[in-house]
Amino acid sequence: MPELVPPSTRVQRSFIDAMVEFLDEGRGGRNDDSMVARELREFGSVWDTPEGFAQYVERLQADAHESTLRASYLVPSTTYWWVEGPEYLGRISIRHRLTPRLLEIGGHIGYDVRPSARRRGHATAMLRAVLPYALE
């Protein structure tokens, strides 16, 4: 049964496979400003190494803190991964506050389900599982 977990190096191989799926569907291009695209551009070249992937996981965890340096258009957010055993299925992020743009497009919660796991209710299940954390 899938579960919501903090980002972890435990699912590195499956996570990388999911990112390849996103690339195959056209994500990550210059005009794509999604979280997946930003991370593909920033970390895609280092995910294959244990050190690079650990650095990426640490960055996701640091993004939850207001004191973390970030681009002016980004806000603090807490990210959880949706996994089933060693399989990465998707992610969901809670933005701690909103910019004027996020008020119009984006909102407080953003999510991605890997293409091969779509149409199975994962987005609904992730949202249901993350709502208690969003109330904190």
Description of each model-found segment:
Residues 1-108, 115, 133:
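GNAT-family acyltransferases
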Residues 110-113, 119-136:
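Conserved acetyl-CoA-binding loop-helix of GNAT-fold acetyltransferases
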